[in-house]
A protein has these predicted regions:
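Active-site phosphate-binding strand-loop segment of PLP-dependent enzymes
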Residues: 6-58
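A short secondary-structure junction signal
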Residues: 10-13, 37-42, 60-66, 82-85, ...
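Solvent-exposed alpha-helices and their adjacent loops that cap or buttress functional pockets
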Residues: 18-22, 42-45, 62-66, 77-81, ...
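Conserved hydrophobic/aromatic beta-strand scaffold that supports enzyme active sites
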Residues: 26, 70, 84-88, 179-181
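Conserved active-site segment immediately N-terminal to the catalytic lysine
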Residues: 51, 65-76
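Active-site C-terminal subdomain of aminotransferase-like
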Residues: 75-157, 171
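Conserved PLP-binding catalytic core of the aspartate aminotransferase-like
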Residues: 167-192
């Protein structure tokens, strides 16, 4: 089974492979999928609002937020402690929730109350503030991108130059910079 998987190259779909259903309200994608280590190396171009889960690569590379309808990211990967979520939403997409949507899941609620509908998680916000200060002091998002490319490439080079001892079956340009996934060619060793 491992040999079969090793021969199957995984990748993000190409732009021309994206099929948006007529009448679709939006296109959702996860910019960096952590289980298999697959990242979108491009931003999909579509004629509907683009919704992105950037939980695992938030603040790891420059992003033109004007190209998105909504971006959300759980802070626990790159921005702060678990329990804090960042949402960047285009104003024209607010106020469209179904009547059955709970108040706490309606982004319009947070916009109306400047993100303080309920007691803000002050400790989580404080930690995220410290992360932002550190990130800026280190050179900002472009520096984080440079570092993630450098670090991940060192690991991918070790995998690719292991004479088959390790393998990664992700197309090179779809390889995650945030989490490098690999296996051992010998399935018995994977079980240890």
């Amino acid at each position: 089974e491992a040999a079969e998987v090793a021969c199957t190259e995984l990748r993000a779909p190409r732009q021309d492979e994206l099929a948006v259903t007529d009448g679709a309200a939006y296109l959702y994608y996860c910019s960096n999928e952590t289980v298999n280590g697959i990242r979108y190396w491009y931003r999909p171009e579509v004629n509907v609002p683009l919704i992105a889960d950037m939980s695992s690569d938030f603040l790891s590379q420059p992003v033109d937020i004007s190209k998105y309808g909504l971006i959300f990211a759980g802070a626990q990967k790159n921005f702060g402690p678990a329990g804090l979520t960042v949402v960047i939403a285009r104003k024209d997409l607010l106020g469209r929730a179904e009547s059955t949507t709970p108040t706490m899941l309606d982004y319009q609620t947070y916009a109306n109350f400047e993100s303080m509908y309920n007691t803000p998680p002050t400790f989580a916000i404080y930690i995220s503030h410290l992360v932002c200060k550190w990130l800026l002091a280190e050179g900002g998002v472009k520096e984080m991108e440079r570092r993630s490319i450098l670090k991940s490439q060192k690991i991918y080079d070790a995998i690719d130059n292991s004479d088959g001892f390790y393998y990664n079956n992700i197309e090179k340009r779809s390889r995650s910079r945030m989490n490098v996934v690999f296996n051992l060619k010998n399935e018995e060793l994977n079980q240890l």
